[in-house]
Amino acid sequence: FPAYDVEHGEAIFFNQMNAYREVDKNFLVREVIRASTAAPTYFPVAKLNNQSKEESYSLIDGGMFANNPAFCAYVEACKFPFQPSPDDIMILSLGTGSKGKTYPYESSKRWGKVRWVVPVIDIYGSAGSQTVDHQLKVLYRCQHIRDQYFRIEPDLSQFDVSPLMDNVSTKNIKALEAVGEKMVEEHWDKIKAFTRKLYISQIGCQPDEFYRMK
């Protein structure tokens, strides 16, 4: 889980390995989730204390620097003691959706500082997310590794939904659930292939063979 410490001015990464190794890196999961999703203007800064109460952080949403944290997850996985290679790491990256906003040249060329505020935030988030997706695709492709990384990112402009984070109306929640179901339907073959490969890597046999042995 990525988050940003505004008091110390640094990116923080929470993971299980650190929690097991060091008591001052052990935090309650609910508090880590609260901190890593504390989006400015939507939620207040989260004050997070570790289990020993000896260290604290003042945290905001990790999306401020890692809107798509897939590469962060990859790097954290590389820290395991057995030093995994890309061939040992499988990543299913799930995006929350993009509106695919564009800004025509004729209008944007006349914008001033105030008019650019919202577009800059939108571009920063979407471009950063796309960059991570591109980098991971190239990383796996250059290693000649197939079917171990893929990303699902719905284009919300194709659906009747609101992308606003604070729109929690029943209608919008149901619409977003429908988008999720549609994405599963569209990517079902890839999801099956991915989960099957993951299963084989962990169990050592095909899922149907495992259940026959049971």
Report each predicted region and the residues it spans.
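Conserved catalytic cores and adjacent C-terminal regulatory segments
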Residues: 1-214
